[in-house]
Amino acid sequence: MMAKRLLNHPQGLSSYTARLAAYGDHLVPPVCLLCYSAPDIGHGLCSHCQSALPINRNPCPVCALPHHGPLPCRRCRENPPPYRAIVAPFVYAKPMSQLIRHLKFQHRLELIRPLAELWLEALSPMADLPMRLIPVPMDRRSLRERGFNPAVEIARVIGRNLNIASDVKRVVKVRRTPPQSTLSAKQRTRIRSGVFQSIAPTTEGLIAVVDDVVTSTETARAVADCLCTDNNASVVVWAIARAAVPHDVRR
């Protein structure tokens, strides 16, 4: 019952974990959430682990594919996506991949706030801010199994910091899909159709779709597709990390 109340609370799980972390800091000095040895210098990480985070340098300006810019990659040129651009400041590689895996598969909820803060720190001050955030939804069965949606919790932290509303009900996932790591590129494209559905009219203006990791971009394309059906919205995708190779990530 308590878990259900936390999931349905408007501030989400991250607000509760933040309170617990603040209380715990008075009892035990904070240490790095990754190596557990060195002191935390900010964002939950020690100086060594923070300096080791893989920055997404020179990415494709459209899909954020690492080490490809400054011109759009071949896929974005030949098959332009429905979103304007993906903003993913980190590459999905160690130690960033460890942080995200720990959050998703070990239920390390204390990592939500540090990951969101790292993304916020990397956001360009010149970036156009959206009118609302829409986290990538999970299907009901997957949400029950995991107990929380990382994209929802990350979006809530980002939204509170930027004073942007996070709309968790605008898009729903109506069909369960296999893990992307088990699919080829053609299979990912084939199953994309009809997976997500927008259940409310799309608001005009800029919308940011929020996810933890972008792999093949098929999820980003599918969510943007259903948001842009009326051609009155512009979509960007905000993610913590971008995989250099599509099979790098377990979903």
Per-region residue spans from a language model:
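Glycine-rich phosphate/pyrophosphate-handling loop used in enzymes and phosphotransfer proteins
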Residues: M1-R251
